UniProtKB/Swiss-Prot annotation:
Function: Binds calmodulin in a calcium-dependent manner in vitro. May play a role in general plant defense including R gene-mediated responses.
Protein name: Calmodulin binding protein PICBP
Disulfide partners: none
UniProt keyword annotations, A-Z: Calmodulin-binding, Plant defense
Statement: the UniProt record of this protein carries the keyword Transcription regulation: no
Region ranges (Calmodulin-binding): 493-592, 831-938, 1135-1229, 1379-1483
Length: 1488
């Protein structure tokens, strides 16, 4: 279509439009994500766009003064209008300048607008009837298009803006359609914009106005950040100070605002709720429509409105800004109205509120990190140790930080990590420089200069101002002297204290100076630079919200502080490291202490009873000064006076309240709790530093002046201090009860955790001599338990665990000094006579109590990392499957928590044993010190001090050759105290003894039981586990000594009859051989440590003797030893037994032997079942043998029984002589389980001996350094004390054992009596009675019962034959012994009586076990389906049988079998059965 009025210009405009379209297509290809341009009106007059009346109004209406009327009506109007059309003349002069200016600009970016910013389709100008339709949006301006536009405007000015014909509607229908479309679009857009109006984001840009309306004033009046008309950013006077946000940020802010308006931002709501509860309303808020209108009305046209999006981090430690990377943050929208400075103030208030909310939880983490780093940093030799231990923590925390970051910002966080590290290190270094600059080596000059209150106040003011002015980044911090209003009160109390003691002035001033320096140090670590709102590239970065767990955030913060402190301390000069020592002393004197008494009242001196009320008041004051959840934390953001009061009150709580004269030498136990640690250890620290004690005593006395003396009440300072403390006590008194309960619960768990570690280390310290043998046994044990497929993975896991524990040992042992200095200090303190000198000697010890606590904490932390390796390995199927049936050994393991924890303990047990076995002798001595440290921390007090003669390690009572060292010169009082401490720990009450019997009756593999928390119950369980093993060993020693091998072979044959599978029998034989080798190794190990008798009689100086000398001496003294063992209850042989092989040595050797054999019980007798090569064509008859828990235990005992017999039978004659000595050890040390084998009269004595052996074994296990001779002498007195209690306990045990076996014994006695009666009755009457008894049970088939009766009779016959033969052989042996030893009739009679009782007990136990196997005999036979099923319906008879009926059926089965066996016995055997009945009558209550 041609234009009759402007033909040339129309062609040019059309060409320019086509060129714009092509350029637009190219730009869309270049951009990955095209941004929609806002639709602005163009100047092309195409279509019926304008009317004649509207065009003059457009160019004449855009003035700066008509802004008020238009802006109130529309939200997206431009604010530049002109009053009259006179200014249009100036357009011609301004346009060339603007064109040149645009040509110079290299890049003109496009405006990306949201749908929210799309213009309204219609707008009213001066009236409602006049409509103006917006044209398409302006495309990218070029030089050609701008020239064409200028020409158009000039032509319009010349022709008076005549209306072209194409602007007029052709028909009424066209005009109606245009009006309808305009109304619909306007209504839709008004609905969309109505709820999304915002004063700062919905403003129109300069391109909203007509492009030709720009004038001279337009550049000055334009208030928009970016103007498409001018093609550049506007920089006004107000914007010079703060950078202008870019277009990209402006667009992103509008998009974010849209999303938040549609759905209310949950994060802002949550932040507002949490902050409003604690710290008042939130600074940032969301602007509503009403508020935006009010802001629009108040705008004057200046470029002062700015919208900033500020991210306020709320980190836990409130420290550096860069530390907030990887943490959760909250975004707060702040509207800055008229002034940039006002916006800065608003942002500072919001940030300060969020920061102050988190400063309360800073203290514990910061105190702990600084204390640990300073303690490790000032030691020159610890650099390597810190390097090794810190690498693991850095790696772990780096992983935590990386996992915490979102997937979108990982690259950005990775770039900033190094920057964060460097800035944190610089901050900490500045803090160290400031604090170390004020620490002098000689505190005397500083102390003398400050002697008055005025000097104190002036000095503190200068120091505080200097500390604040030294750092420019922390200018917003207030001076310390203004905040510490109560500092003069403390100074006055110190000055008043000088009246009572003038010699303490310098120490008090140094103490107060330490408080101030540490306070400044913490503040300098906690300072925060002011955030710059917009700075170059950082202003364009959009901060995003991240979500992170609290635990990960805490680890990241601790790692950041740890890393910075380690880097700073490593780079310090030697002179500065000396100053760090002073800082460490300050931490030791000011570290937060918990003085609550939880079971440590025995350590407090008797003088404290007078001041219990004062202690209780101060305790409440200390706990009320803090929050209920975190009382022990010292927050750096709090006042200095509050910190001083807390530290002084905490130290005062732990000091014995004595008189003023005794305050100088106070030795107080304090408790240091670490709330942040994962292990939560309870550690008792005896404060032995004299300077620390004096300082704390002075501070405590300064706090309690108003409570002690009447003269102190006159001072106003003390009154104000007491009032201040009383107010705090009343306000925070409600939180005390809940906190005490939480602390008590934590204390129990902490002590339990530490006791487990102490027990593990002590266990391996005692058993480290035979570590190589244990290593082989554990390897065999893992092979049997896990199988051959898993051994490679288990070896790798074990190697990793051993390596980590070795690193832990190297770390902890490198910091433990040699014991020579400790021994010298102990000897010096023992020679001193006065108590003050003793305390001073203790404080001079290099390895003080606080260092022990720190080392133990590190050691436990390093050991906890060992639990990470998982010993399990994926089971992969073989690559080539065999044609044979696969032998799959399935090992079912429960998933309960107890099983997992026990598996971890087993892994730690193995790793500790391996690590201790590889230590050098010097390091083993240091491990002894570590064990002593565990004892001190757990028990709360040191063991009695040893003299030079008795200062050997804990394990010197047994050496590699098994020779205890005789120690002389020990004081009687100290020895008695030591014995009391040993037996006071392991006294077992009556309830624990009952629990011991229950444990004895439980199955051996009780892995699913819950973990035992009580330490005494754990001891009882260990005794119960060992009791069955002691019984088996004793049984085989007795049988070997008496030569009863034939009976054992028959009993084993009876047990072997249960295994009816031939393939299983072959593999059981293979298992036996392995078990025999293990038992033989255990025997060789224990026999090699049994010394010769003659060497014990002469002296114990020689450590190594040859085997030949042992054989000769044993052969010479064998008869003498037998006489000694036979007459153990006579006082004639007690002296000889004292000189020789004492009871303590026997207990240790037997305990080791039991522990060696204890690993064999885990061997499972089950074997993989192999399918046959050729399956039988007939129907397979499968016999399922249900094995109960008792049966499983019996099978294990049978396996050990067989292995012990085979091992003893293959011993050499010389070793069999040693076996006789071992059997005599069993005679002298009677066991708990053998009490039932004695007569009722001798039950109490045997119980006493068993109790004596158990207590002595535990004492030797945990207190190896105790003198063997002293313990043996004290055991006699203990035996006399336990006789009365043992009688009652023995009766209860006898009743329980008799109840267990009463049913079987009653059946046997009944059968013996029936046998005697049946001999007199005729055979006919007996047959009738048997038939009647058989008819009673109608549910059992006759044919099947005959088969089972014969099998049961054969089993019982074999058992009785074996027992009868044993009894006859025993009688023959006893007769021979009585004939040979006719001269010693008394000794032989006692021996015969004792052995007869013991043999009866053994034989009866075996017989009862055999009968229990008969009871397990299942009379039911598997029911097979017929090969040809019948057509009729199957008739199934269900027989419901109760538990009592089932029990009666079992008893009837045994009764019937006994009747059959007894009736068929020969007269000779019936006589032997009578002896068996007599044995039952002597041991059973039913016989009486």
């Amino acid at each position: 279509m041609s234009n009759p009025m402007f033909p040339e210009k129309w062609e040019e405009s059309s060409t320019s439009k086509s060129s714009r379209r092509v350029h637009k297509r190219r730009e869309r290809k270049m951009w990955k994500k095209p941004i929609k341009l806002s639709r602005f009106p163009s100047f092309g007059f195409s279509g019926s766009d304008f009317t004649l009346d509207q065009i003059p109004a457009i160019f004449s209406g855009y003035t700066a003064e008509s802004e008020d009327s238009s802006s109130s009506e529309m939200s997206d109007d431009s604010r530049t209008y002109s009053k009259s059309s006179d200014e249009n003349e100036e357009l011609d002069q301004e346009r060339p300048r603007s064109v040149k200016r645009r040509a110079k600009s290299k890049s003109i970016s496009r405006i990306s607008s949201m749908k929210v910013l799309r213009r309204q389709s219609t707008r009213t100008l001066y009236g409602a009837g006049q409509r103006l339709k917006k044209m398409r949006s302006m495309k990218r301006l070029t030089s050609n298009s701008r020239q064409i536009l200028r020409k158009k405007n000039l032509d319009r000015g010349d022709f008076g803006l005549l209306q072209p014909h194409y602007l007029r509607p052709t028909s009424s229908s066209a005009s109606k359609n245009v009006e309808n479309n305009q109304k619909n679009l306007g209504a839709a857009r008004l609905k969309r914009i109505a709820s999304l109006r915002y004063n700062g984001l919905l403003k129109a840009t300069c391109s909203s106005a007509m492009k030709g309306s720009s004038s001279k004033r337009s550049n000055d009046v334009c208030t928009y950040r970016y103007c498409s008309l001018h093609g550049r950013r506007h920089s006004h006077a107000a914007d010079n100070n703060a950078g202008v946000p870019s277009l990209k940020r402006f667009v992103s802010m509008r998009r974010k605002f849209m999303n938040r308006q549609k759905s209310v931002n949950r994060r802002l709501v949550l932040l507002k709720r949490t902050l409003s509860r604690k710290r008042g309303p939130l600074g940032g808020r969301v602007v509503t429509d009403q508020e935006s209108k009010e802001v629009d009305d108040n705008v004057d046209g200046d470029s002062d409105e700015e919208v900033f999006e500020e991210e306020v981090s709320s980190s836990v430690d409130g420290g550096n800004d860069n530390e907030s990377i990887g943490r959760s943050s909250e975004t707060v929208m702040v509207d800055v109205d008229d002034n940039v400075d006002r916006g800065m103030d608003a942002m500072e208030t919001v940030a300060s509120k969020v920061q102050e909310s988190k400063t309360e939880t800073v203290g514990a983490t910061l105190w702990r990190a600084i204390c640990e780093q300073t303690v490790t940093g000032h030691d020159h030799d610890d650099g390597k140790v810190d390097g090794t231990t810190s690498d693991g923590t850095v790696g772990d925390n780096e992983e935590v930080c990386r996992e915490g970051s979102s997937g979108e910002l990982r690259e950005e966080d990775g770039k900033k990590t190094e920057y964060v590290w460097n800035e944190t290190v610089t901050l900490v270094k500045q803090a160290f420089d400031e604090i170390l600059a004020e620490i002098t080596d000689d505190d005397s000059s500083d102390d003398i200069s400050m002697t008055k209150d005025e000097a104190l106040e002036v000095g503190l003011g200068e120091e505080d101002v200097g500390a604040d002015s030294s750092d420019s980044s922390c200018s917003d911090m207030q001076p310390v002297i203004e905040r510490d209003t109560h500092l003069s009160v403390i100074a006055s109390t110190f000055h008043m204290r000088d009246e009572f003691g003038h010699q303490r002035g310098p120490k008090k001033w140094s103490y107060l100076k330490r408080v101030i320096l540490l306070k400044r140090f913490l503040k300098s670590l906690d300072r925060k630079e002011r955030r710059k709102l917009s700075d170059g590239k950082e202003s364009e970065t959009i901060m995003r919200l991240r979500r992170e767990l609290v635990g990960e955030r805490k680890n990241a913060e601790e790692w950041m502080l740890d890393h910075a402190l380690r880097q700073v301390i490593s780079t310090l000069a030697p002179s500065q490291k000396k100053k760090v020592k002073h800082l460490v002393k300050a931490f030791e004197s000011l570290i937060p202490m918990d003085g609550g008494s939880r079971g440590h009242d025995d350590l407090v001196s008797p003088a404290r009873e007078e001041n219990e009320t004062v202690n209780s008041q101060t305790q409440t004051i200390l706990r009320d000064n803090k929050d209920a959840t975190d009382i022990l934390e010292v927050s750096p953001a709090k006042d200095l006076e509050e910190t001083n009061l807390t530290c002084e009150a905490s130290s005062f709580l732990s000091i014995d309240m004595k008189s003023d004269e005794e305050n100088e030498t106070v030795n107080s136990p304090t408790i240091w709790r670490d709330n942040e640690d994962t292990t939560d250890l309870l550690e008792v620290v005896p404060a032995k530093d004299l300077e620390e004690t004096n300082l704390t005593s002075e501070s405590s006395s300064s706090l309690c002046i108003g409570m002690k003396s009447d003269e102190a009440l006159e001072s106003t300072a003390d009154a104000s201090l007491c009032n201040h403390l009383a107010v705090e006590e009343e306000v925070d008194g409600l939180a005390l009860g809940s906190f005490i309960e939480e602390e008590e619960k934590k204390g129990e768990s902490e002590k339990q955790n530490l006791s487990t570690w102490r027990n593990l280390i002590q266990k391996h310290m005692v058993m480290r001599d035979n570590s190589e043998g244990n290593r082989n046994e554990t390897e065999q044990e893992h092979k049997w338990s896990y199988g051959t497929d898993q051994m490679t993975g288990i070896d790798d896991a074990n190697a990793a665990a051993v390596k980590s524990i070795q690193l832990a040992f190297e770390t902890i042992l490198s910091e433990i000094p040699d014991s020579s200095s400790d021994e010298e200090s102990v000897s010096e303190s023992s020679n001193s006579l006065k108590e003050e000198k003793e305390h001073q000697g203790e404080t001079k010890r290099s390895w003080n109590s606080l260092r022990k606590v720190i080392l133990l904490k590190r050691f436990v932390k390093s050991l906890e990392k060992v639990q990470v390796p998982n010993p399990r390995k994926m089971r992969n199927l073989p690559v080539e499957s065999a044609f044979e049936a696969e032998n799959v050994f399935l090992r079912h393991r429960s998933i309960m928590e107890g099983t997992r924890t026990e598996g971890e303990e087993m892994m730690l047990d193995y790793a500790l044993r391996q690590a201790i076995s590889r230590l050098a002798p010097i390091q083993r001595k240091k491990v002894d010190l570590l064990v002593q440290a565990f004892d001190i921390v757990l028990d709360g007090h040191d063991t009695p001090k040893q003299t030079k003669n008795s200062d050997t390690p804990r394990n010197n009572d047994e050496t590699k050759e098994g020779k205890p060292r005789v120690e002389e010169g020990c004081e009687v009082n100290k020895d008695e105290q030591k014995i009391k401490n040993v037996f006071a720990r392991f006294q077992v009450h009556q309830k624990d003894l009952k629990g011991e019997e229950e444990v004895h009756n439980t199955p051996k593999e009780s892995r699913n039981l819950p973990p035992i928390r009580n330490f005494k119950q754990r001891i009882v369980v260990e005794k119960g586990k060992d009791s069955r093993m002691w019984k088996l060993i004793y049984k085989h020693m007795v049988t070997e000594k008496e030569g009863i091998d034939s009976a054992n072979a028959e009993s084993v044959a009876s047990v072997e009859s249960e295994y009816d599978d031939e393939a299983g029998g072959l593999q059981i034989d293979a298992r036996r051989s392995g078990t025999v080798t293990l038992v033989r190794e255990a025997l060789e190990k224990i026999l090699s440590e049994i010394p010769d008798n003659s060497s014990d009689d002469q002296s114990m100086d020689s450590d190594i003797t040859t085997e030949q000398e042992l054989f000769e001496r044993n052969s010479q003294v064998s008869e003498e030893k037998s006489e000694v063992s036979s007459a153990t209850f006579k006082p004639k042989f007690t002296e000889k037994r004292v000189k020789g092989w004492n009871n303590v040595k026997k207990v240790i050797l037997l305990k080791r032997f039991v522990s060696d054999l204890g690993s064999l019980t885990r061997l499972s007798p089950k074997t993989p079942r192999v399918l046959p090569w050729e399956p039988d064509p007939e129907t397979e008859k499968i016999r399922l043998r249900h094995q109960e828990i008792g049966g499983k235990r019996n099978s294990e005992e049978w396996m050990l029984d067989y292995a012990l017999r085979q091992a003893i039978s293959t011993l050499a004659p010389s070793q069999k002589r040693k076996v006789s000595l071992l059997a005599q050890a069993f005679d002298t040390i009677s066991l708990q389980d053998m009490g039932s084998g004695s007569t009722p009269g001798s039950a109490a004595s045997s119980r006493n001996i068993s109790r004596q052996s158990s207590i002595s074994s535990m004492a030797a296990h945990y207190e190896n350094e105790a003198n063997a001779e002293i313990i043996r002498g004290k055991l006699r007195n203990l035996q006399e004390d336990l006789k009365e209690s043992a009688k009652l306990d023995g009766v209860s045990k006898d009743l329980e054992e008799k109840q267990q076996c009463s049913s079987l014994w009653r059946i046997l006695c009944k059968q013996m009596e029936d046998n005697e009666k049946n001999q007199t009755l005729p055979e006919e009457t007996r047959k009738e009675e048997e038939e009647e008894e058989l008819k009673e049970d109608t549910s059992v088939d006759g044919e099947k019962m005959e088969l089972y009766q014969t099998e049961a009779v054969e089993l019982l016959g074999e058992v009785i034959d074996g027992i009868s033969l044993e009894e006859s052989q025993d009688q023959n042996l006893n007769n021979e012994e009585t004939r040979q030893k006719s001269e010693t009739l008394q000794v032989s009679k006692v021996r015969i009586d004792r052995w007869s009782n013991l043999k009866r007990a053994i034989l009866l136990r075996r017989f009862v076990k055999a009968l229990e196997n008969v009871r397990k005999f299942n009379p039911r036979e598997p029911r097979f389906l017929p090969p040809n099923p019948e057509v009729e319906a199957e008739k199934v008879n269900l027989r419901h049988q109760e538990t009592q009926n089932k029990k009666n059926g079992d008893e009837w089965m045994v009764d019937n079998a006994l009747q059959g066996v007894v009736s068929k016995l020969t007269p000779a055997r019936k006589l032997k059965v009578q002896l068996l009945v007599q044995a039952f009558e002597s041991l059973s209550a039913t016989g009486n």
